[in-house]
């Protein structure tokens, strides 16, 4: 009796290890979160003559699934319900009618970790390949976007910056690009895996951060890259010197030098004119003073018949007249002296007064 009970078990085990049913698949695969992977797979099964015209359906199940109750994660059977969390992300790309059971996984998520097995059904022929199974490992997303800057950044000149994720999958959900920058920017054209930012930097933007952030919405993960802007600033109107060259320098530099030279020459000429004018005024004033002194001396003629008293009085007033030329004596006394002298003297001034006149002229 115990032997009769063992016979069905042995028969089931023989079906499970039936050499007519075999499968080749990569036993372990690793994929980064948010990315995709394609797992090649091939299987074989015997085809009874009565099932030759039956369609072939393939299914991928999680390890431990109960076929009659649990839904597969992927299948080529159109009316078959699949697991909600894997719908649209797990796909049976291979054609089971051609013995192809290849599986595609896109927008990989952490909860996709685990083992999976394949099952085929063709008419009355149905078989689950429990060995080997596929083991899926989902790791952190370590890839980062790449930022391309063509040429150098100059203040006031627009440049197109490109952020790309060439390592992303074509079949997955298109990533979402975001830019963060303090400089004036605007969005340019974009493709599935790249975005263009039009930036017009300013001098104060040198050394500031620019970030390109990429979100993979299908997996809920984000990656980014940050760079520092290198804005090359060259002064537009330098006037500190003239540098030799081939004549191809900027007009602004030459104009600045010419304007500086003209301004310097103008200032120099103005100073020279002021000095000449001052010198002319002083010289003219002194000449007038000298002529006035000579005229006053001529209005005091002396005669031989003049009394000694008158001569003495005239000599006493001589220094007063000389002082009056320099503005030291009062004008009233000067007029009185001139009136008195004109009535009493008819001769030339003494030689002493003449020498005094030339002594004053030499002081000019």
Swiss-Prot record:
Binding locations of D-galactose: 154
Annotated TM spans: 260-282
A GO molecular-function descriptor: carbohydrate binding
Residues bearing attached sugar chains per UniProt: 100, 113, 160, 209, 230
Organism, as annotated: Homo sapiens
Signal peptide: 1-17
Region of interest called Disordered, as start-end residue ranges on this chain: 290-364
BP terms from Gene Ontology: cell adhesion; cell-cell adhesion; cell-cell signaling; Fc-gamma receptor signaling pathway; immune response-inhibiting signal transduction; negative regulation of cell population proliferation; negative regulation of interleukin-1 beta production; negative regulation of interleukin-8 production
UniProt gene name: CD33
Protein name: Myeloid cell surface antigen CD33
């Amino acid at each position: 009796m115990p032997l009769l009970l063992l016979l069905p078990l042995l028969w089931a085990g023989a079906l499970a290890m039936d050499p007519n049913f075999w499968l080749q698949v990569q036993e372990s695969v690793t994929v980064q979160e948010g990315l995709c992977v394609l797992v090649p797979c091939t299987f074989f099964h015997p085809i009874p003559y009565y099932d030759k015209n039956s369609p072939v359906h393939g299914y991928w199940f999680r390890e431990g699934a109960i076929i009659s109750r649990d839904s597969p994660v992927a299948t080529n059977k159109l009316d078959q319900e699949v697991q909600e969390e894997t719908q649209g992300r797990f796909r049976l790309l291979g054609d089971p009618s051609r013995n192809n059971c290849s599986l595609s996984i896109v927008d990989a998520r952490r909860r996709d970790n685990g083992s999976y097995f394949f099952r085929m059904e063709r008419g009355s022929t149905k078989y689950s390949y429990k060995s080997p199974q596929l083991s899926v490992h989902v790791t952190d997303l370590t890839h980062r976007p790449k930022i391309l800057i063509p040429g150098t950044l100059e203040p006031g000149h627009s440049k197109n910056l490109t952020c790309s994720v060439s390592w992303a999958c074509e079949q997955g959900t298109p990533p979402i690009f975001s830019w963060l920058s303090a400089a004036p920017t605007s969005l340019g054209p974009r493709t599935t895996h790249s975005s263009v930012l039009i930036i017009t930097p300013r001098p104060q933007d040198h050394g500031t951060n620019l970030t390109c952030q990429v979100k993979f919405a299908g997996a809920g993960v984000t990656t980014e890259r940050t760079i520092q802007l290198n804005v090359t600033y060259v002064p537009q109107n330098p006037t500190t010197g003239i540098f030799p060259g081939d004549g191809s320098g900027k007009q602004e530099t030459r104009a600045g030098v010419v304007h500086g030279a003209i301004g310097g020459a103008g200032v120099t000429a103005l100073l020279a004119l002021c000095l000449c004018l001052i010198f002319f005024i002083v010289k003219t004033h002194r000449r007038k003073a000298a002529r006035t002194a000579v005229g006053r001396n001529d209005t005091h003629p002396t005669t031989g018949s003049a009394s000694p008293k008158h001569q003495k009085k005239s000599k006493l007033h001589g220094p007063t007249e000389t002082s009056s030329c320099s503005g030291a004596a009062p004008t009233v006394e000067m007029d009185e002296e001139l009136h008195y002298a004109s009535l009493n003297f008819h001769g030339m001034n003494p030689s002493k007064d003449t020498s005094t006149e030339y002594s004053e002229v030499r002081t000019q």
